[in-house]
Design a protein with these regions (language model features):
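Mixed-charge (Asp/Glu-Lys/Arg
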Residues: 1-241
Length: 242
C-alpha cells in the first residue's frame, strides 16, 4: 500500500461526527482544487444540531460545476454510517409522507443531493438499485428532472479520499495511524493565546518565485502564483523563510 493510502474498511471505524467531518473536509479540498474558497462549504459539526436533512452543504456562486465528485455548485451531502437499502433511502428522503422540503428545494434550483453511506460497499447492480430508489422518491416532484442524485458507498468515499493527501493525513491521524513529521493543514503559526492570527502582509515581507525572474511579490500577490505552481509542478515544493 502506498504511503498516502488507506483501506476502505478502515473507514468503518469512523463515528457519525467523524464521517460528517470527513465529507466536509473532502468537499472543501475538492472545490479548493478547482479554484474556489473552502468557505463555500457549510456543515454543523454536530449530529445533534437540527439540520433539515443537510449534513454538508456546498454552495459555490457559479453557474456550473462538474468535478467528478461534485457535479453541481449547490450540493447537499447526507452522511450515513450504516447501510442504506431502499427502505432506509425512502425513509430518509420522505418527511411527514411527502418529499423532504430540502430535496424539493434542491430540485427547484437544479442542485444535487448525495447520500454517503459508510456501511455500504456496492456492486454496480446494488448502486443502480439505490439510485433507482432515490429517483422513485422524487417521481411526483415537478422539478424531478432538474436535480442531480448520487449515492456514494465506502469504495467511492475512499476513492475521493485518495485524491486529497492532506485530508488523508487527517483521516489517518483520526484512526491512530498518523505519520511522524507529517501534519494536515492547521494553525501552524501557533500565535500567543488571545492574539489575532492574521496573515503577515506588512510592507517589506516579500516572496520570490522560481518563475518570477527575481521579482519580489507581497504575500497577498504571491498566493495565487504559489497555488498554481503547486498544482502544475512535478517537483517537490519547499517554502523557506518566515
Amino acid at each position: 500500500m502506498a504511503i498516502f493510502d488507506i483501506e476502505k474498511d478502515e473507514l468503518l471505524r469512523f463515528s457519525d461526527t467523524q464521517l460528517e467531518e470527513l465529507i466536509a473536509r473532502l468537499a472543501e479540498a475538492e472545490i479548493a482544487a478547482h479554484g474556489h474558497s473552502p468557505a463555500y462549504v457549510h456543515w454543523s459539526g454536530s449530529i445533534n444540531a437540527p439540520d433539515g436533512g443537510i449534513d454538508v452543504h456546498v454552495q459555490v456562486p457559479i453557474e456550473q460545476m462538474s468535478t467528478g465528485f461534485i457535479e453541481r455548485p449547490d450540493t447537499i451531502f447526507q452522511a450515513k454510517k450504516y447501510p442504506m437499502p431502499r427502505a432506509a433511502i425512502t425513509s430518509e428522503m420522505i418527511t411527514d409522507g411527502a418529499l423532504s422540503p430540502t430535496i424539493s428545494e434542491q430540485a427547484a434550483k437544479g442542485g444535487s443531493y448525495i447520500i454517503v453511506s459508510l456501511g455500504d460497499d456496492c456492486s454496480p447492480l446494488m448502486k443502480r438499485d439505490r439510485l433507482k430508489a432515490m429517483k422513485d422518491v422524487i417521481t411526483d416532484d415537478p422539478n424531478r428532472s432538474n436535480i442531480h442524485l448520487d449515492f456514494f458507498d465506502r469504495s467511492k468515499l475512499v476513492q475521493w479520499l485518495r485524491q486529497h493527501p492532506s485530508v488523508m493525513l487527517w483521516a489517518k491521524r483520526i484512526l491512530g495511524q498518523g505519520y511522524s513529521g507529517w501534519q494536515p493543514y492547521g494553525a501552524w503559526s501557533n500565535p500567543p493565546q488571545g492574539s489575532v492570527d492574521t496573515l503577515i502582509s506588512a510592507p517589506g515581507v516579500t516572496i520570490t518565485l522560481p518563475s518570477g525572474k527575481g521579482q519580489k511579490l507581497a504575500i497577498q500577490d504571491a498566493i495565487g502564483p504559489m497555488r498554481e505552481l503547486i498544482r502544475s509542478t512535478n517537483k517537490a515544493v519547499r517554502i523557506t523563510g518566515l
